[in-house]
């Protein structure tokens, strides 16, 4: 029988599997391949596959003993249809001293967006790190000196996971601006999304 249709959002592990599918640029993504790349237990991966299957956007099938996921949609269309299930990876945001920046952090927010589009960079540099690697108690809510502080986003998953440079990956970056009302940012996000999914 058909699995119940998904209402609500993907859990973050499913979102990562979805991103892996988008970035793999292949029609079929073998679950065993995904298991090698994603930092999940086998059980978490199985759940993520099941959740993708409940969306009608993916087909889960087997070739011999190898399970795979496949979508009938092109990447740009798939992303548009999946947007209702996707969430911003940003769990918390605050400020830290510039001296606290580590190599586990990558550019994110407006800083990363301005590197990849026509958007002018904001004065305060934004970084991201997985919430697992950073104690949120160390964030301050107040920006006192933009020359001495940076903005830090704590993400639900590692912003380096799909990154190809020193910034968070493009699609997660797009998702991190889900709640923006700034037209300049919306334009830049659209530009980045379009370019990334046309490839």
Question: Where are the language model's segments positioned?
Answer:
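Short acidic, hydrophobic short linear motifs in intrinsically disordered regions
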Residues: 25-38
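Minor-groove-contacting beta-hairpin "wing" of winged helix-turn-helix DNA-binding domains
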Residues: 65-73
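Short, amphipathic alpha-helical "recognition" segments used to contact nucleic acids or chromatin
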Residues: 18-26
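Short alpha-helical segments that sit at the start of domains
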Residues: 1-18
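A short, conserved structural fragment
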Residues: 53-64
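Long, low-complexity, charge-rich intrinsically disordered regions
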Residues: 1, 83-199
């Amino acid at each position: 029988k058909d699995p119940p249709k998904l209402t609500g959002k993907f859990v973050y592990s499913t979102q990562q599997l979805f991103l892996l599918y988008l970035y793999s640029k292949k029609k079929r993504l073998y679950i065993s391949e995904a298991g090698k790349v994603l930092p999940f237990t086998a059980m978490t991966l199985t759940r993520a596959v099941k959740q993708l299957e409940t969306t009608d956007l993916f087909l889960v099938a087997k070739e011999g003993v190898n399970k795979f996921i496949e979508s009938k949609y092109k990447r740009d269309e798939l992303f548009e249809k999946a947007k209702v299930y996707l969430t911003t990876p940003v769990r918390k945001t605050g400020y830290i001293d510039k001296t606290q920046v580590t190599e586990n952090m990558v550019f994110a927010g407006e800083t990363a967006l301005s590197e990849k589009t026509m958007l002018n960079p904001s004065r305060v540099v934004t970084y991201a790190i997985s919430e697992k690697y950073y104690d949120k108690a160390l964030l301050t809510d107040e920006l006192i000196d933009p020359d001495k502080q940076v903005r830090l986003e704590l993400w639900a998953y590692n912003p380096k996971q799909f990154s190809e440079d020193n910034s968070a990956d493009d699609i997660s970056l797009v998702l991190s601006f889900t709640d923006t009302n700034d037209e300049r940012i919306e334009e830049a996000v659209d530009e980045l999304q379009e370019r990334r999914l046309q490839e």
